[in-house]
Amino acid sequence: MHFDVLQRLSLAGDAMKPNEDAALAEANAAVVFDGATPVSEPLMPGRSDAAWIAQFGARRVMAHLKEADTPRAALRHALADAERSFTGLRRRAPRQRHEWPYASMMLAVPRDDGLDALWYGDCALLLVRPDGSFDSIGQAIAKKALEASDAARFAKATNTAPTGALDTMQFLELIRSARNKLNATGGTWLFAPMAKASEHVSHARVAAPAGSFVLVCTDGFLALAGDYRSYTPKALVGAAASKGLVTLGAELRALEDGDPEGRAFPRFKKSDDATALLLRLA
């Protein structure tokens, strides 16, 4: 089978900052990347190391898939490409792990009987079959709930609005501490310019017939079915097909504009970058 690419959407969370998401889709594959918000000075040329790793990763994964690589081989080669590019172009070597560029990823590749999904972090794949059955791939919903709980707790402890946390040194140090545990033995692994990250990707094989709708998205878009509870995950796929991604993007931003401090819906950013691809298996 192949993908019919129906719709695409990618919205920056802040018009004054780079969009640190990336997405590409063709008949043979679809991928979204969500660059992790930088917490140190950039090491690469350009405004954002997070935007670099997301865009580079998306391009290289898709390029290797076009060369008929298997999904795992394409990922392995893309990570090796990223390691070489980072080593060659960076201003200096990272001193601590929080200085590395990281990204979440969801890669979907169609098969004769459904699709393969490979992922890091908190991007999501939602699938609705013609008979109405539903699958959710990844841990994004659970991670969004945990982040909302953390935002509410941090705001209470510091007597600040949740969306003000990013401006505090206390929060920055917490994030750096968490990042220093990434891509290490026993820790969480994300897409990064480290070839060995290919050994730690999550994988699922999903059986689905032609006519199934597939929504691949970053957690910023998934907030409609997580933080803001506007839709169930399954209903979000239906809304994408019936209303369109542009309309859903407008709904997302309207909710955030109505709660700029994150008090009704606790979160660390007023608006996150939000990216989605709507596909159909054919």
Residue spans for each PLM region:
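PP2C/PPM-type serine/threonine phosphatase catalytic domain
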Residues: 1-282
